[in-house]
Structures are given as structure tokens and as C-alpha cells.
């Protein structure tokens, strides 16, 4: 008991005067200590045993509060060979494993006592012995175990006695482990003058506590001071575990290292370490340590601990509305309905309702009724009318009605609805308008017939309408594939009642509709007619007929040629005819050899390798630039073929534009020159805002003013616009230092892209863009690839590093000059003159079978999407190329990057279909991204591409249905992780379908192979669940 004072101290045998001081005996207890013995609190006699009897003396005095003060004293310093023992009563150890003994005592300085230098001591010894029961009066000192020799930090003298100064010493010793039920303590004196004022025996515990809303019970620490006891807490009332709450009990009785926590359940909030129910008028919808919230408008609650507020009468909350959203009500009726009618179309327009009910999801429905003279005699209009775009779920305030009948009273009821209209039992408010039709349009075409069919064509005819109501201007024929009725259609016109439709697919059924146009307008479309194109056998029969015609024509032509030949021989003009014919044939052969076959309206890619001289290919597709128009400013990069500079290009009549310039170094090989010019001849064929633009080339004239002999051909890939190397000094005339000799460089001049390659640009600006901005970048890349695909060009190295970004964030596809050599060794990498093509971007069929196509470019585009959404992260991270190939073969696909909307990741998965024919076309991708940009809310909706995925349930891959998550894990040989999934709360397939690779690592799946197998199965499960839900991904 620190800080206590002795009330009375009496030294025996007359050597000292009594020392009287006040001692209250009121000592505070520490919360982490459990006291087994405290002599200062014992009210009766201690009854400790002494040996011999004339050794230790017990002295008891009463303090001012009438409480006893027990002391034991000994001072036999005059006689040698002292051996005085004092033993406590039996002490129960309770739950202790280690005990602590605190002793308060005073000790006389031997130097202050005359004539006792040989016999006086200044220490005493502490002993103990364990026992399961009391020994009574039996006492055998030899059986006791020594704990320690106790010495005083301060000893008193005769002067201290005179000045009434008490020097009290406190010493603590620990004993353990204690294994029996109890123990004795013993004090041995061998000749000291000492007074044992108090003895306190205790053990330490980590006391009951509440941390992070979790309760932890009293805990006894281990004997080993370096070992901690892990204790799991239990959540306080009205709370639940978020992460398992844990504390560690230290050897000193202190709680250490808090882990995990509990959170208040729904309807409860945390106040001063406990969970209290929300007051009436307040709610809390989700478990967590947030405060209760006031009920939103038009809702209330009158009880405590409410998780959701109830809507007032007439107000509702939709199923998907969050609890924090105000209750809303159905809208009022639309206003100001008006119509506009012509011969063939009726347009209905209206104003929004005056009261939207507090919601933004307003839609309209139009109900049509045909009424007679009596307004009460109405019937439904049926399927005869067509509504554009549709009669229900309208977002805009108008609709077009077609195919109505003349001289009929139509009543249109326009209803306004929102997300809670279906919850109300009240009739839906509407506004009605009645329209009487009177049209002069032609009647419908009644019949269409097929005259003949080939593999790619159909010849159709029909009869003119019975009532045209004027001169027929033309016919419009609309047609589409029967299987793709809802996707797209084509149309053509004919002035005659017949038409030949070309460009069709063989053995395919098409649907045709036809309508008439007169001066009064269009008629309605006819009913649908089905016709099928022919197959190869039908064309063979047609070809046989054509052969007969050709053979007949050939015989006639040969006869005519003989007659003409005789005629020219007779007239003497045969020689002129033969020369002219030879000249014409030679010109035609030369034209064919150069592969310059052009078709009107169609631009196709021409491989520069078909030209003997690469310079011919370059000048076929790109213009020569006068070197005097080029001003070089600085070197911005270096590569295999030379250096890349930035500069300015002067254009007559226009201002200077920034450009990037690269040349071929002097002393180059013919192969290097061919590869260098090949890139320019490829770029020169492209003209698209999302393709890097070639300004021109320099191949014919020397350029001594520049004096540059080396430029890098890989500048379109290596982020050159960011300045890879420190700029070289440039003279005022625009040339580099004279140490570089003048020469005759081959130069390629392209537009300057300020922000460099896309991957490094995104890494530099990580997290700076909105999702819509990133989608805009992806849309630009897809548009450029669509252009290349339409031209028949396969890129084969599409990656973010090969996309360049200008100052307006426009992305442009680059890197067209790399030659791609596929070695015979099946283990060979796909090499180029610029290095290896990374496996991570390459489609599996291109890796396995060397099959590059637009579909393999689509696979690479999916990887580019992942790079963009992850801000330039490396695909497949640190996996080796071999692991990447094996993972893809096993069905593994990259997970969604952080913050990536579900619809974009789903598009990536479509691009990574193993069957290349199932991947979307770039046309589909551009269309889909356009819709996302127009409707950003669709970014967070899971979609399925019906052009990519199987079109009927029978085409869906077989996937077993599992009853439990454990069954699913067993099926993929991962049953050892059942407890991990259960403990983490992933107990339903809906939750599992949303798991990411981070979730799988977090629950304890460490092995990469196991992670890969589980992720692969989750992706298959997710696609299967999407088919079950029958969601559409329309492009």
C-alpha cells in the first residue's frame, strides 16, 4: 500500500525509543489486482506462527478510526547466530497462476547502533511453500523455498527517531507458477533490527471491459510474461459482429491489441459504449455505428427501435427506394393534350402533370378505344394500330399513331405513372382526347410473290393497290432477317410493282413489308411476307443455264471474229488492230499486277508488301513534303531506327502545326528501309479522327539544314510525347549540333500527340477522370478499330501503350509498322522487329494457331478496356506468360477493376469469349458505348449481349444447379474452403456471383491456382445466372 505511514513503531529490548506516527491504513486498490491477503485490513489478530518464540513479536495498535494496525518486529542484534522465522497462515491462491508479495517495512542502520558491528544485519529473507491444505501448527523451515533476500532502500538512525522521521520501504516480489490450491509465506531474520508494517499478497488479471461494443470478461494472464492470452469478446445487447472482436491479455493485467468490432443493429445507435433504441420519429435502416436519422418527409414512426419509417396515407415507397428517400405518391393526370393529324399519321402531344408525386421516374401510357356515336359504346382498338415508339412506358411527351382507319372516332386516354403508381389502389388519373379520322391515303398492298431466288438475291413483284387516291410515286420495301426482327432492317424503293433485292445471305428467311407513296402521303405497311433465298444447289442449276447461254454466245462471237479478221486482212488494217490490242492488253496486265483494283464506294486496305518497291506504295497513298517546310525543335525520343523529334510543319496558306518527325538513320539496311516505309504506306491509307494522322513523308530530297540521321520507329508506342530523353540543344536555324553529319534522311511526319501513350497518361492521372470520360476514351478507340475492321485491316498489337492521347483527350490508334514473324517452333513468342508481342493482350486462338482476325483484335480491345478502367494497371499483374495462357485456357478472366461499372466489365467478358465467333463486332461495341454515354444510368446495370451470347436457352452451356454453396465448392474440388466461405458470410449464390479476387484472398484462399479455379467458376456461374434472368444487351 504505497504512501502509508506507521502509527506506532516500538523497538524491543530498550535500545530505542518508541516511534509514534499517524498511519491511516486507507490504501486504494488497483482494478487489475485481486488481493488474497492484506494485513492492513484484517480486523482481528493475525495469528501468524513464530519460531523461536523469542524471535518475532506481534504488536497491534489502534488508529484514530479504531482500526487495528498489525506489525511484526524483531531486533535481536546483540546476539550472534540469529535464526528467527515468521510464517503466515495458509493462503488460498484462488485463480492465480503467479502471485505478487508486497512488503512494507522499516530497518535500523547497523552503524547507528553501538557495539553490534559483528552481529547486526540489514536484510531478511522471504520464503514460500505450496500446499493443498492448511498444515496447522506444523512448521518445517527446511521445506520452504527461497524467494529472495530483501534489503532496505532506506534505513533509519537514532537521529531519525529523535526527529520522528519514518523511512518506510516497499518491496514487491513475484512467485510462480503456483499449481496447488494454496501456499504459505515465511520471513527469516538473521540479526536485523526490522519492523514488518504490512504484507499484501495479490495476483493480476485483465479486468472486465467493453471495447468497440464488445464485452471481455476477467482474464488471468499467463505466467510467461512474453505470452499473450487471446480473448474473444461478446457483443453488447442490440449489437452484432462486423469482424470478430478480440483483445489480448498481457502479463501485467493490461488489455492489448484490440481487433474487430461489434456494431449496433438496425434501429439502434451507439451512445457511450452501448446501443440505444432509436427514438420515435427516428430510424436506422442498416447495422452500423451511425446515428439514428430523422424520418424522411411524408413518413413517420411512433415506436422505438424502428428500422424503417412508414409512409403516410396516400404516399408510398417503391421496392428499390432506399429507406432514406421520402415517401412519394402517384402523379396527377397529364395536361394540355393535343393532336396533329395528316393522311397517314396521328401525333399526340401533352404536357407533364402538375404534380409528379415527388419522383423523377415519370412515364406515360396511351390507351386507345374506338367509340361510336354513343360515347358509352367503346371497344379496345386492338392490334391494328401501331404506336411509335410504343404505347406504354413512354418517356417523352408525345407518341405517333399509324395504320388508323378512316371515319372512326378514336379516344385516347393518356395516363401518367411513376414508380409507386402500382402500389396505389386508386384509379390511375388520365386525360382523354377524341380524334375523328378522315384520310385519303392509298389502300394496303394485299399480296406479294417471289418470281425467282438465288443465293444472294430475291426477285419480288406485287399488284398495285386497289385504291391509290392519286398517282403512285413509288413503293417502299422494308426487309430484315426473320431471326433478327428486333435488331435492324433495310429498305429500298422501286417505281415499278417489282424489285430485285441483292446482298442477301444464302438459305436465309427474310421478312418483307411494302407500302405505297402518293401525293397524299404513305399508306400503311402491308402484312409481312416471308421468302427464303436459295442455296448452292439452286445456283448450280442457274449456272448451268448460264453456261448454255455463254457457250452459244461464244460460238457466235467466234464466228463474228473470223469475219472481222478476214475483213481487216482484206482492207490492210490488220496490223494496226493487232498493235492496238497488244498495247491495251499490256496496260491491263500492268494494272492488275499492281493490285489497284478499285470498287466504287468501297475503301479497302491494300497490303504494302504487294509492291516491289516500298517507295511506290508510300507515294501511292501519301504526299511528299518539301523539307524546307519542316522545322525541328527538339529530340524527344530514341529507338531502334533512330531518333524522334518534335517540330513544326508549314502548310501554304495555313498556320504552322505541331508535328512529330522521325527519320531512318544513315547506313541502314534495305530491310530496315522497307519496314520503315511500310508503316507510312499503311498509315497513309487511313483517314479517321481516331487513327493517328500521317501528314506526309520525305524520301526524294536531301535535308542538309536539319542534319539529323536517326529517328526511332517505335515512337508511336513508347510514350515519346512525354519526353523520354532530355532534349538535345537545337540551333536557331532549326538544326541539331553540327557533330551530326548532313545526309539524305528518309522522314515520316505525323500529327503531334501532346499527352503521349494512353497507359502512361492514365497512370500519371490515376483517379482524375469520371467514368463517362473513360467511356468516351473507349468509344474513340472502338470507333477507330471499327474503321480499320471495315477496311479489312487486322491490327494484331492493340494495347493501351499503342493508343496516343492529344490535348483534348482524343484517343487515336497507332503502331502500324511492325512486321510480325511467326516462327516454326510451337513454343516461340510472336516476334516483331520492335520486340516480342506480349501474350497478355493476344487472343487464345492467335497464341495457339497463329490466327489473327478482327475477332482477335476484339479480344485485345477487351484488355484495353481493362487497362483504361484500372488506370494503366498491368493485365494479369505479376503472373508469368505461361500462367496467363494456362489461366485463360481454364476459363479465368480478369476481374472488374475497382470502381468499374458492371456493364463495362460484362462487355469485357463478351470480348473475351473463347469462341471467336461469339465475340461482338466493333460496330456493336461502338453502338453499345454510345448508348451508355447517352444513358449513364445503364452503366450500373448488368447486361447481356444477344449478338454474342447464345440466342436460345438450348444454346446455353450446360451448367449444373447446386443446392448449397458447399455442393458448388465440392464440384470444383475446392471443398476445403467451405468454412472460409461460411465464416465470411458468402452463403448464397447471389453473393458469390459478386465476389472479386480480393474477396477470395481476404477469406483465406492463398494458393494462386485455387484462386484462379474459384474465380473461373464464379465467372461461369455469373453468366449462367444472367441467362436465367433473361436480360438483354442490345446494340
Swiss-Prot record:
One of its GO terms (cellular component) is plasma membrane. Residues 960-1024 form the SAM domain. It is a single-pass type I membrane protein. The modification Phosphotyrosine is found at residues 605, 611, 830, 977. The active site is at 797 (proton acceptor). Brain. Glycans are attached at residues 342, 396, 409. Residues 571-1035 are cytoplasmic. Its main location: membrane. GO terms for biological process: axon guidance; ephrin receptor signaling pathway. Residues 330-440, 441-536 form the Fibronectin type-III domain. GO terms for molecular function: ATP binding; transmembrane-ephrin receptor activity. A motif (PDZ-binding) lies at residues 1033-1035. It is found in: Membrane. The chain crosses the membrane at residues 550-570. Heterotetramer upon binding of the ligand. The heterotetramer is composed of an ephrin dimer and a receptor dimer. Oligomerization is probably required to induce biological responses. Interacts (via SAM domain) with ANKS1A (via SAM domain). Belongs to the protein kinase superfamily. Tyr protein kinase family. Ephrin receptor subfamily. This is Ephrin type-A receptor 6. It comes from Rattus norvegicus. The lineage of its organism: Eukaryota, Metazoa, Chordata, Craniata, Vertebrata. The gene is Epha6.
Amino acid at each position: 500500500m504505497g504512501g502509508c505511514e506507521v502509527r506506532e513503531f516500538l523497538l524491543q529490548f530498550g535500545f530505542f525509543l518508541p516511534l509514534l506516527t499517524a498511519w491511516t491504513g486507507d490504501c486504494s486498490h488497483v482494478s487489475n489486482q485481486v488481493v488474497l491477503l492484506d494485513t492492513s485490513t484484517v480486523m482481528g489478530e493475525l495469528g501468524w506462527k513464530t519460531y523461536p518464540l523469542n524471535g518475532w513479536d506481534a504488536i497491534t495498535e489502534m488508529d484514530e478510526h479504531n482500526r487495528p494496525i498489525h506489525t511484526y518486529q524483531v531486533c535481536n542484534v546483540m546476539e550472534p547466530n540469529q535464526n528467527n522465522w515468521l510464517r503466515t497462515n495458509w493462503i488460498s491462491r484462488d485463480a492465480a497462476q503467479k502471485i505478487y508479495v508486497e512488503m512494507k517495512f522499516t530497518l535500523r542502520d547497523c552503524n547507528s547502533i553501538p557495539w553490534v558491528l559483528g552481529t547486526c544485519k540489514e536484510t531478511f529473507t522471504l520464503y514460500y511453500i505450496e500446499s493443498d491444505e492448511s498444515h496447522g501448527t506444523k512448521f518445517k523451515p527446511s521445506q520452504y523455498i527461497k524467494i529472495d533476500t530483501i534489503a532496505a532502500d532506506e534505513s533509519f538512525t537514532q537521529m531519525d527517531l529523535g526527529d520522528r522521521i519514518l523511512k518506510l520501504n516497499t518491496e514487491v516480489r513475484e512467485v510462480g507458477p503456483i499449481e496447488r490450491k494454496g501456499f504459505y509465506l515465511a520471513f527469516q531474520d538473521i540479526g536485523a533490527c526490522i519492523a514488518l508494517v504490512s504484507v499484501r499478497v495479490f495476483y493480476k488479471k485483465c479486468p472486465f471491459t467493453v471495447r468497440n461494443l464488445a464485452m471481455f470478461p476477467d482474464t488471468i494472464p499467463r505466467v510467461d510474461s512474453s505470452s499473450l492470452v487471446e480473448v474473444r469478446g461478446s457483443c453488447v445487447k442490440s449489437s452484432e459482429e462486423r469482424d470478430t472482436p478480440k483483445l489480448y491479455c498481457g502479463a501485467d493485467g493490461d488489455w492489448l491489441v484490440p481487433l474487430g468490432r461489434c456494431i449496433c443493429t438496425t434501429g439502434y445507435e451507439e451512445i457511450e459504449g452501448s446501443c440505444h433504441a432509436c427514438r420515435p420519429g427516428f430510424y436506422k435502416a442498416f447495422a452500423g455505428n451511425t446515428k439514428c436519422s430523422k424520418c424522411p418527409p411524408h413518413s413517420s414512426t411512433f415506436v422505438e427501435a424502428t428500422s424503417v419509417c412508414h409512409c403516410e396515407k396516400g404516399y408510398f415507397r417503391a421496392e428499390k427506394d432506399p429507406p432514406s428517400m421520402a415517401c412519394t405518391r402517384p402523379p396527377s393526370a397529364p395536361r394540355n393534350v393535343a393532336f396533329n393529324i395528316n393522311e397517314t399519321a396521328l401525333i399526340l402531344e401533352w404536357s407533364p402533370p402538375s404534380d409528379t408525386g415527388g419522383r423523377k421516374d415519370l412515364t406515360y401510357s396511351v390507351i386507345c378505344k374506338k367509340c361510336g356515336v354513343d360515347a358509352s359504346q367503346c371497344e379496345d382498338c386492338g392490334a391494328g394500330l401501331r404506336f411509335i415508339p410504343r404505347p406504354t412506358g413512354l418517356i417523352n411527351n408525345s407518341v405517333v399513331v399509324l395504320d388508323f382507319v378512316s371515319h372512326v372516332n378514336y379516344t385516347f386516354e393518356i395516363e401518367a405513372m411513376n414508380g409507386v403508381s402500382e402500389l396505389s389502389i386508386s384509379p390511375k388519373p388520365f386525360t382523354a382526347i377524341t380524334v375523328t379520322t378522315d384520310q385519303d391515303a392509298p389502300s394496303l398492298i394485299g399480296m406479294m410473290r417471289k418470281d425467282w431466288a438465288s443465293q444472294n438475291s430475291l426477285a419480288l413483284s406485287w399488284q398495285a393497290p386497289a385504291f391509290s387516291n392519286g398517282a403512285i410515286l413509288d413503293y417502299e420495301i422494308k426487309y430484315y432477317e426473320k431471326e433478327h426482327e428486333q435488331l435492324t432492317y433495310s429498305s429500298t424503293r422501286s417505281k415499278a410493282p417489282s424489285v430485285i433485292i441483292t446482298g442477301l445471305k444464302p438459305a436465309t428467311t427474310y421478312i418483307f413489308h411494302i407500302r405505297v407513296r402518293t401525293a397524299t402521303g404513305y399508306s400503311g405497311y402491308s402484312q409481312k411476307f416471308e421468302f427464303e433465298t436459295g442455296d448452292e444447289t439452286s445456283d448450280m442449276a442457274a449456272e448451268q443455264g448460264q453456261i448454255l447461254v455463254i457457250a452459244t454466245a461464244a460460238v457466235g462471237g467466234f464466228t463474228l471474229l473470223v469475219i472481222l479478221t478476214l475483213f481487216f486482212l482484206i482492207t490492210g488494217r490488220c496490223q494496226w488492230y493487232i498493235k492496238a490490242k497488244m498495247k491495251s492488253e499490256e496496260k491491263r496486265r500492268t494494272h492488275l499486277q499492281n493490285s489497284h483494283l478499285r470498287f466504287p464506294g468501297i475503301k479497302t486496305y491494300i497490303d504494302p508488301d504487294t509492291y516491289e518497291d516500298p517507295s511506290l506504295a508510300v507515294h501511292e497513298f501519301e504526299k511528299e513534303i518539301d523539307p524546307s517546310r519542316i522545322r525541328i525543335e527538339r529530340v524527344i525520343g530514341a529507338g531502334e531506327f533512330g531518333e524522334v523529334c518534335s517540330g513544326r510543319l508549314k502548310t501554304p496558306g495555313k498556320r504552322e502545326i505541331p508535328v512529330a518527325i522521325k527519320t531512318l538513320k544513315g547506313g541502314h539496311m534495305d530491310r530496315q528501309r522497307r519496314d520503315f516505309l511500310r508503316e507510312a504506306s499503311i498509315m497513309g491509307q487511313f483517314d479517321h479522327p481516331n487513327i493517328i494522322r500521317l501528314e506526309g513523308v520525305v524520301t526524294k530530297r536531301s535535308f542538309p539544314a536539319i542534319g539529323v540521321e536517326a529517328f526511332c520507329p517505335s515512337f508511336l508506342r513508347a510514350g515519346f510525347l512525354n519526353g523520354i530523353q532530355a532534349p538535345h540543344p537545337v540551333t536557331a536555324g532549326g538544326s541539331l549540333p553540327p557533330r551530326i553529319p548532313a545526309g539524305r534522311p528518309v522522314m515520316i511526319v505525323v500529327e503531334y500527340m501532346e499527352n503521349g501513350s494512353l497507359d502512361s497518361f492514365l497512370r500519371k492521372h490515376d483517379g482524375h477522370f469520371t467514368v463517362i470520360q473513360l467511356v468516351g476514351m473507349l468509344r474513340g478507340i472502338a470507333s477507330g478499330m471499327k474503321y480499320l475492321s471495315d477496311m479489312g485491316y487486322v491490327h494484331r498489337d492493340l494495347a493501351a501503350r499503342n493508343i496516343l492521347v492529344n490535348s483534348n483527350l482524343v484517343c487515336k490508334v497507332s503502331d502500324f509498322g511492325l512486321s510480325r514473324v511467326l516462327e516454326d517452333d510451337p513454343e516461340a513468342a510472336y516476334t516483331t522487329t520492335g520486340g516480342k508481342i506480349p501474350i497478355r493482350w493476344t487472343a487464345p486462338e492467335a497464341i495457339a494457331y497463329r490466327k489473327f482476325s478482327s475477332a482477335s483484335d476484339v479480344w485485345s480491345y477487351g484488355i484495353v478496356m481493362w487497362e483504361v478502367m484500372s488506370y494503366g494497371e498491368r493485365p494479369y499483374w505479376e503472373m508469368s506468360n505461361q500462367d496467363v495462357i494456362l489461366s485463360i485456357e481454364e476459363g479465368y478472366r480478369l476481374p472488374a477493376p475497382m470502381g468499374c461499372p458492371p456493364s463495362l466489365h460484362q462487355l469485357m467478358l463478351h470480348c473475351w469469349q473463347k469462341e471467336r465467333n461469339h465475340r461482338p463486332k466493333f460496330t456493336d461495341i461502338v453502338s453499345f458505348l454510345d448508348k451508355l454515354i447517352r444513358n449513364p444510368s445503364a452503366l450500373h446495370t448488368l447486361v447481356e449481349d444477344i449478338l454474342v451470347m447464345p440466342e436460345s436457352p438450348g444454346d446455353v452451356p450446360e451448367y449444373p444447379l447446386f443446392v448449397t454453396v458447399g455442393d458448388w465448392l465440392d464440384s470444383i474440388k475446392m471443398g476445403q474452403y467451405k468454412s472460409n466461405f461460411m465464416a465470411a458470410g458468402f452463403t448464397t449464390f447471389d453473393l458469390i456471383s459478386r465476389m472479386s479476387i480480393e474477396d477470395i484472398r481476404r477469406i483465406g484462399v492463398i494458393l494462386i491456382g485455387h484462386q484462379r479455379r474459384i474465380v473461373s467458376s464464379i465467372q461461369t456461374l455469373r453468366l449462367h445466372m444472367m441467362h436465367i434472368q433473361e436480360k438483354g444487351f442490345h446494340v
